[in-house]
Amino acid sequence: MNEIKKAALHTIDAHANTFTAISDAIWDEPELSLKEFKAAALYTDALEKLGFTVQKNLCGIETAFSGSYGSGRPVIGILGEFDALSGLSQQSGAAEVQSVTPGGNGHGCGHNLLGA
């Protein structure tokens, strides 16, 4: 395994609890596209605590942001969606339909995980 991959895996493992907590919080409070204010705040706060420089309100979109860390190479870009969909409210860990709020918002495509 090369050194970059080892470093990436070490960093992911070191922050796994943070990533899981963010994912769970976003699952628990699903917000529709362009209205993910709580989720965006969770992400930007976490990035800032990890030493990233965060730009908020990208392109006039209140929930869009970017985080930069370090300089030089490699340059890595990641797009993470974190919006919910209407009508997909679901209890965590349930294999069959068990809505938290019937007809409410929920994460059916893993967007709570993609952003984290």
Predicted region positions:
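DPxDG-like acidic metal-binding loop motif
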Residues: 115-116
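Acidic/His- and Gly-rich active-site-bordering loop/insert found
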Residues: 2-107, 112
